[in-house]
Structure formats: C-alpha cells, structure tokens
Amino acid sequence: MMRVLWITNIIFPAPCKELGLPSPVYGGWMLSSLEAIRQLHPVVDFAVATVYRAKEMKTIHTDGVTYYLLPARIDNTRYDKSLEAYWMKVNETFRPDVVHIHGTEYAHGLAFIRACGADNVCVSIQGLVSVIARYYYAGLSFWDILKNITVRDVIRWDTIFQQKRKFEKRGELEKEYLKTVPHIIGRTSWDKAHIWAINPDAEYHFCNETLRPVFYQRKWEYDKCDKHTIFLSQASYPIKGLHKVLEAMPLILRHFPDTKIKIAGPSLVDKPFYRITGYGK
C-alpha cells in the first residue's frame, strides 16, 4: 500500500470537528482532491499534517485518514526550527512514500524538508510570494500608501510597506523550497516559467485543481445571472486589485450605469476605526 503524506496550510474539517474549532472556509480544493483520490485509489494510505496554535502535537485518526497537528511556536510566515523534531517523528511514524507540500507560501513545510530531506517530496504551487512581492503595491504610489496609514497599521506595525517586506522575507524561504525539491506541480505557464528560472533541474508536472462539489452542481446561465456585476473573490490587500477596479468604474458606469461590485469575504470598511487597514481606508 502506498503511503502519502500531505502537508497543508489549513486544518481540515474532520480534525476541526474533533478539536471544536471552526472549519476553514478556504482551501476546499484540497479536501475535494483528497476525497476524489481516495475514491479512485482506495488502497492509498493518506495522512494530512499541518500546524496549529497549541503546546503539544496531536494525532487524530478519523474517516480512514490520519491527521497530524504540530504545535507552532511562532507565526507561520517565519521559520520555526522547533518543528523539525516533530516532522522527524511524523516521518518515522507514518513512513510516507510520497510527501506532497501544498503551497510554498508558509514555512512549516520547509521544516520537513530540512529535517527529513527532499528525495520523495513534491510541492504544488498555490502562489509565488517571491514573485508577487515585486508587485505588492500594485500601482499605489509612496504617497498613496503613506497618507492612508491607519491607527491599526501603526499599532500592529503592519502598513503596506511592512506587508511588502514580509512577502519578500517569505519569498526567500519559498526559493529554498523550489531549489531543493525534485518535483513541482503547477497549472499555468506563468508559474512554469518562474519555476524554470528558479530551478531548471526540477521536473514540472501540470495538474489542474479539483474544485469543491458546489462548482460542478450548477451551470452559469445568462438569463439567471446578476447582470452587470463585477465579482472579486478577495480584496483585502493591494495585489488583489480592488483599487484598480474602482479606478475603472467611472468609465464602466458611463456605459453600464447599473454596474455593481460584489466582494467575497469580510468588509474592509464596516468595522471599528481602530481595525481598518490602510488599504481599507
């Protein structure tokens, strides 16, 4: 029986239920992919590992999957050396044939590589922070950013300037991922080009993501759609481009005066003043 270890950025719903935690509202493609693979290849033994805010490691067996929750001492965007011992324990206990790290944006998967090696490891690209960091301001000028700094930004030391720097630091860790692993999974010519530039010796595998079931249950129909609506799946920071959509709205409204913008997720502005970000302002 093949043994596959997934390293993810979220806690899956099953262990969330065991721990009394709210289930994540994002990353649904990973759950759908896990369910689809288990149906197609029931002989594969799966384990899913991630980090959580706690003091001890937990192992949960449910629905035929083993879940490992590793205690994180620091913010997951920074490297946590204490995770290396836990990863060695997971590796020795589960003995995976293949390790699949979902995403290179966070540092906990890199701790596995440093502790256990990369010979049987592949990573899949969810976004390349080392590249995105270059464009983090997304056309905002120095003055645009400076004049909109809020109380929340100052207290948390989290202006758009600092956010860009954090992306750059995460990008340094991401490049170590990509330079080390022999196999990389992606789905666009954009990520393939950047992977080749960083590690031309890695073997690139094209693979589209599996969406949540709801995306396959209904079809878009013009007669039933909310016409002249622009939908943004995220808008919490500059690279998602909300400010560019707003800049374009006068031109759009000239031709389609009933145009609406809908944004998924929490409001950027409907909150106390001390919680509004500079970008939300």
Report residues per predicted region.
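A conserved nucleotide-sugar
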Residues: 249-281
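N-terminal subdomain of nucleotide-sugar transferases
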Residues: 1-55, 61-66, 252
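Membrane-proximal helix-turn-helix segments that form the acceptor-binding/catalytic region
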Residues: 145-184, 193, 197
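Short N-terminal targeting/anchoring amphipathic segment
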Residues: 90-106, 112, 120-122
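Active-site proximal beta-strand in glycosyltransferases
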Residues: 4-7, 98, 115-156, 185, ...
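Acidic anion/phosphate-binding donor-loop and adjacent secondary structure
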Residues: 196, 210-227
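Short hydrophobic signal-anchor/transmembrane segments that target glycosyltransferases
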Residues: 40, 115, 243-257
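Conserved donor-binding/catalytic core segment of Leloir-type glycosyltransferases
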Residues: 5, 221-240, 246-249, 261-262
